[in-house]
C-alpha cells in the first residue's frame, strides 16, 4: 500500500528565515536542517519543542549556522535524540561554525542558550552518521524500507542534495545549490538518480537574482582590482566572511593571485579566526569532497591547495598587532558584522577613509552589515555616523576584583568542606558495614556454641559421657599443628571472643594501611586545592560591559558576489530538468515562489505545486498503491521485461492468492478462479449459517485464456528532441505554434488528459512518411 507522506514547515516558509522542516513517512519522522538566524532568534525553534522527541533522523544539507545553528539548542533543551546524518565536511566544518559562534557570543555577552557540551553531543560518534556523496544508506528500525543518499550540491564543501526513497516514492530535498564550477568545488550534479522524483522540495529565494559576472574569471579580476587599488592607496581591506564555508573559495583565489604577482609580497594577507588553524587543517584533509581541479593539482604537484604560502593564519587580535606595520587584507568572521573579530576591526577602522570593507556574501536583512550598506548607498551616506551597541569582556579591578576573589575563596572553601563531608560519610559507611559484619559473625559464633552445649547436655543425660570427659582435650589436636595429618601444617592464629579478626584492605601494591590511606587522601585534597588555586590565579576574572558607540562611517564599502548560489534563470532550468511529479516551494517571498510556480505551470507537467506557510502541514501521500507479492517461478519464466531507469517493467495477468499457513500473498498465472459457495445459502440459512460464512472453493479452468490488453507507452520525450530524431532520419520538420509540421503531410502535438498524463497526437495523410514517423516515435518509448 502507499506510504503516508506529510510535510510541515517549522521555519523558512514564505520568507527567508532559516530552513527547518519536518518530513513524515508513515510513522518515521525526519528533520530537514535546523537553522538559526543571524540574530540568534531562538523563538523560531519553539515549534520543535512539541515534536523534538519523536524525531528519528536529522538530515543536514550544509554546515553553516543558517542550516545547523539551532541543532545544539534543540538537543540540549528539547531533548532531540534522533540520529544525525551528513557528509564528513558537514561534521568537521559544522563543528567549527558552532564553536566560533559560541566563542564570539561569549566575548560579547553571557551566552547561555547552549554550551560546548551540547555542540559535542551533536557531532559525537554515537550520534552523527557520516556519509559520502552518492552513498545509499538504508535505515533500520522504524525506518526500515527507507533509504537516504546525499548528492553533490556545490556552494560549500560537503553540501548535499538529499534523496529519500521508500518503495517507488522518491523525495529530493535541494536548497542553496550552485550550478557553476568553482576553484575548490564542483557544481550541482544532476544525475539520473535525482531526476523525475515523486516530490521535489526546493527554495525560491534566489529566483530574482541575476549573475553580475558570466564567468568566474571576470569576477575574480574585479575582486583583485578593488583590493590592489586600495592597498596601493595605503589602506587596509577588511573582508567579513563566514567561519568555514565560502571563505575557502576566497582563500584559494587570493592564494593563487598572490603567488602569480610577486609585487604583492609587500602586503600581508591574514585569515583571522579563533578556529582558523583547525578550518585549514580540516580543509586539507577533505580533498575527496572538492573539485577535480583541486584533486589533480594535489596529485600532479603533491601540493595541497590549502597549504597556504602567502596567507598568514592567526587566531587573535594580539597576534595581528604583532605583524609588521604594512597594509593588510584581513578575512575574518562574521560576514554580517554582528559578532567576532570582523565587528571589532570594523569599529577600529570604519573612521579611516582609506579602509575598504568588502562584502562577498548575501547580507541578512537588518544586520549591521545591511544597515551599513543601505546608509552608504544613500546620497551623502559616507561620513554619517551609525550607532551600535557593543558588549565586551574587561578585567575586574578594585572592589569588584576583591569581591570576586572573596566569592571564589568562599566557593573553594565550600567545595573543600563538601569533599571532607563526603569522605567522612564514606568512612562512617565503611565502619557501619564492618560493625554489621562483626555482629553477623558474633551471632553465628553464639549459635555454634549453643548448639555444641545442647549436644553435650543430651549426651550427658543419656550417660554417654560424664563431666570429666567434657573437659578432656584431644591429644592429637593442637592449636598450631595437626598431628593426624601426614605432615605438619602451620595454621594461622584465630582471634577469640571478644576480639574479632580485622578485614585487611588490598590495593595495587598489597596491603593498605588505614592511617596511611587517610593521610594520603588528605594530602591529595590539599594538592587538588592547591592546583585549583594556581589555576584560578592564572585566570584573569572578567565581566561584560555594554556601551553604545557612535561611529563615523568614512571608510569605503563595496560588494561583490562570492555567495556561490544559483541565479533565477538557472533555478528554473534546474527545476525543469529535474521534472518532479509534485513540487514544494520554500524559503522565499510569496512573489518569488509565485514566479517559479507560474514558470512551472507553463513548462513542466506536474500534479501539484505547494507553497506552505509556517506551521502548515501538507499531505503529499502518493495516489499510487504499492503491494509486495511473491512471484511463482511459473510466472517469472513467462515475463518479458523492459529496462526503464532502475526498474524492470512487464505487463502480466495473474491471480493473487494466500497459501495455507502463510500471510504473504502470492501472484501466479490465471489458471483458477476463487468463487464463494453461496448456492445453498437460501435453503440452509437457518441450519448451516456458521458453516457457510467462510466456505470458498476453487474453480479450475482447463485452459488459460487472456483477452490481451492495451499497450502502455512508458517514457517521456520533448518535441524538440523528437524533431532532432526526425531530422536525422531525413524528414523535413519545423515548429509551428507548438506543433511539429513534418513536410506538410504529418502533424505532431502534445496534449494532456484529465489525470495529467501526457498524450502525443499524430495526424496526417496515410503515406510512407506517416508510417516512418510513427515508427520513429514508437522507438522513443518502452512499450509493454
Curated annotation (Swiss-Prot):
**RNA-binding recorded as keyword:** yes
Pull one GO CC term from this UniProt entry. mRNA cleavage and polyadenylation specificity factor complex
Q: Which UniProt keywords apply?
A: mRNA processing, Nucleus, RNA-binding
Among InterPro entries, the record links this protein to: Beta_Casp, CPSF2, Cpsf2_C, CPSF2_MBL, Metallo-B-lactamas, RibonucZ/Hydroxyglut_hydro, RMMBL
Q: Name one Pfam family in it.
A: Lactamase_B_6
Q: Where is this region: Disordered?
A: 676-695
Q: Does the keyword RNA-binding apply?
A: yes
Q: Which SUPFAM superfamilies match?
A: Metallo-hydrolase/oxidoreductase (SSF56281)
Q: Which domain of life is it from?
A: Eukaryota
Which SMART domains does the protein's record reference? Beta-Casp, Lactamase_B
Q: Where in the cell is it found?
A: Nucleus
Report any one BP term from Gene Ontology: mRNA 3'-end processing by stem-loop binding and cleavage
What family does the database annotate?
Belongs to the metallo-beta-lactamase superfamily. RNA-metabolizing metallo-beta-lactamase-like family. CPSF2/YSH1 subfamily.
Q: Which PANTHER family match?
A: CLEAVAGE AND POLYADENYLATION SPECIFICITY FACTOR SUBUNIT 2
Q: What's the stated role of this polypeptide?
A: Component of the cleavage and polyadenylation specificity factor (CPSF) complex that play a key role in pre-mRNA 3'-end formation, recognizing the AAUAAA signal sequence and interacting with poly(A) polymerase and other factors to bring about cleavage and poly(A) addition.
This protein is called what?
Cleavage and polyadenylation specificity factor subunit 2
Instruction: Tell me what organism the protein belongs to.
Output: Dictyostelium discoideum (Social amoeba)
Q: Which gene encodes it?
A: cpsf2
Amino acid at each position: 500500500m502507499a506510504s503516508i507522506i506529510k510535510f510541515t514547515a517549522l521555519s523558512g516558509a514564505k520568507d527567508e528565515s532559516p530552513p527547518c522542516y519536518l518530513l513524515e513517512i508513515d510513522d518515521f519522522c525526519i528533520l530537514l536542517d535546523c537553522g538559526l538566524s543571524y540574530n540568534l532568534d531562538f523563538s523560531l525553534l519553539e515549534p520543535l519543542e512539541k515534536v523534538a522527541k519523536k524525531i528519528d533522523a536529522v538530515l543536514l544539507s550544509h554546515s553553516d549556522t543558517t542550516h545547523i545553528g539551532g541543532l545544539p539548542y534543540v538537543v540540549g533543551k528539547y531533548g532531540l535524540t534522533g540520529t544525525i546524518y551528513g557528509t564528513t565536511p558537514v561534521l568537521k566544518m559544522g563543528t567549527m561554525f558552532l564553536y566560533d559562534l559560541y566563542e564570539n557570543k561569549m566575548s560579547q555577552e553571557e551566552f547561555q542558550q547552549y554550551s560546548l557540551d551540547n555542540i559535542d553531543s551533536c557531532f559525537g560518534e554515537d550520534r552523527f552518521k557520516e556519509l559520502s556523496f552518492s552513498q545509499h544508506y538504508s535505515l533500520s528500525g522504524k525506518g526500515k524500507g527507507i533509504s537516504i543518499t546525499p548528492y553533490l550540491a556545490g556552494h560549500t564543501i560537503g553540501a548535499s542534495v538529499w534523496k529519500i526513497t521508500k518503495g517507488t516514492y522518491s523525495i529530493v530535498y535541494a536548497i542553496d545549490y550552485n550550478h557553476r564550477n568553482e576553484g575548490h568545488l564542483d557544481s550541482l550534479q544532476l544525475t539520473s538518480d535525482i531526476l523525475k522524483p515523486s516530490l521535489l522540495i526546493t527554495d525560491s529565494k534566489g529566483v530574482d537574482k541575476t549573475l553580475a559576472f558570466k564567468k568566474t574569471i571576470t569576477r575574480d579580476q574585479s575582486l583583485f582590482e578593488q583590493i590592489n587599488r586600495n592597498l596601493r592607496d595605503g589602506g587596509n581591506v577588511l573582508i567579513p566572511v563566514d567561519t568555514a564555508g565560502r571563505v575557502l573559495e576566497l582563500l584559494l583565489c587570493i592564494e593563487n593571485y598572490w603567488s602569480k604577482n610577486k609585487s604583492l609580497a609587500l602586503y600581508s594577507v591574514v585569515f583571522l579566526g579563533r578556529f582558523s588553524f583547525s578550518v585549514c587543517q580540516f580543509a586539507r584533509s577533505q580533498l575527496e569532497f572538492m573539485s577535480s581541479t583541486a584533486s589533480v593539482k594535489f596529485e600532479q604537484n603533491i601540493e595541497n591547495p590549502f597549504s597556504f604560502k602567502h596567507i598568514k593564519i592567526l587566531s587573535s587580535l594580539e597576534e595581528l598587532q604583532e605583524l609588521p606595520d604594512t597594509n593588510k587584507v584581513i578575512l575574518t568572521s562574521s560576514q554580517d558584522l554582528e559578532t567576532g573579530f570582523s565587528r571589532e576591526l570594523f569599529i577600529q577602522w570604519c573612521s579611516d577613509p582609506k579602509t575598504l570593507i568588502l562584502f562577498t556574501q548575501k547580507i541578512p536583512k537588518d544586520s549591521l552589515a545591511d544597515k551599513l550598506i543601505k546608509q552608504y548607498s544613500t546620497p551623502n551616506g559616507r561620513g554619517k555616523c551609525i550607532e551600535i551597541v557593543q558588549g565586551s569582556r574587561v578585567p575586574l579591578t578594585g572592589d569588584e576584583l576583591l569581591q570576586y576573589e572573596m566569592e571564589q575563596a568562599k566557593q573553594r572553601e565550600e567545595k573543600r568542606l563538601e569533599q571532607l563531608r563526603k569522605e567522612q560519610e564514606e568512612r562512617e559507611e565503611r565502619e557501619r558495614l564492618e560493625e554489621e559484619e562483626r555482629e553477623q559473625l558474633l551471632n553465628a559464633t553464639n549459635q555454634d556454641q549453643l548448639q555444641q552445649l545442647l549436644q553435650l547436655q543430651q549426651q550427658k543425660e543419656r550417660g554417654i559421657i560424664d563431666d570429666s570427659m567434657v573437659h578432656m582435650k584431644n591429644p592429637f589436636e593442637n592449636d598450631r599443628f595437626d598431628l593426624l595429618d601426614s605432615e605438619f601444617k602451620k595454621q594461622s592464629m584465630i582471634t577469640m571472643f571478644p576480639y574479632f579478626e580485622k578485614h585487611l584492605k588490598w590495593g595495587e601494591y598489597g596491603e593498605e594501611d588505614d592511617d596511611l590511606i587517610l593521610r594520603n587522601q588528605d594530602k591529595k585534597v590539599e594538592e587538588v586545592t592547591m592546583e585549583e588555586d594556581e589555576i584560578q590565579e592564572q585566570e584573569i576574572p572578567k565581566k561584560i560591559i555594554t556601551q553604545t558607540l557612535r561611529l563615523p562611517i568614512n571608510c569605503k564599502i563595496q560588494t561583490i558576489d562570492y555567495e556561490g548560489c544559483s541565479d533565477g534563470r538557472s533555478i528554473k532550468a534546474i527545476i525543469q530538468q529535474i521534472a518532479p511529479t509534485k513540487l514544494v516551494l520554500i524559503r522565499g517571498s510569496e512573489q518569488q515562489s509565485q514566479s517559479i510556480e507560474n514558470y512551472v505551470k507553463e513548462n513542466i507537467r506536474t500534479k501539484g505545486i505547494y507553497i506552505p506557510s509556517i506551521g502548515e502541514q501538507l499531505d503529499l501521500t502518493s495516489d499510487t498503491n504499492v503491494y509486495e507479492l511473491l512471484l511463482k517461478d511459473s510466472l517469472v519464466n513467462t515475463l518479458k521485461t523492459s529496462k526503464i531507469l532502475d526498474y524492470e517493467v512487464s505487463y502480466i495477468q495473474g491471480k493473487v492468492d494466500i497459501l495455507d499457513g502463510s500471510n504473504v500473498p502470492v501472484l501466479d498465472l490465471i489458471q483458477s478462479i476463487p468463487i464463494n459457495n453461496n448456492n445453498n445459502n437460501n435453503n440452509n440459512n437457518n441450519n448451516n449459517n456458521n458453516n457457510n460464512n467462510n466456505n470458498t472453493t476453487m474453480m479450475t479452468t482447463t485452459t488459460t485464456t487472456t483477452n490481451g490488453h492495451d499497450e502502455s507507452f512508458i517514457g517521456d520525450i520533448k518535441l524538440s528532441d523528437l524533431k532532432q530524431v526526425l531530422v536525422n532520419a531525413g524528414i523535413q520538420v519545423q515548429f509551428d505554434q507548438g506543433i511539429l509540421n513534418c513536410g506538410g503531410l504529418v502533424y505532431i502535438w502534445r496534449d494532456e488528459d484529465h489525470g495529467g498524463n501526457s498524450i502525443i497526437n499524430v495526424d496526417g495523410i496515410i503515406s510512407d512518411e506517416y508510417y516512418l514517423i510513427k515508427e520513429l516515435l514508437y522507438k522513443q518509448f518502452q512499450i509493454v
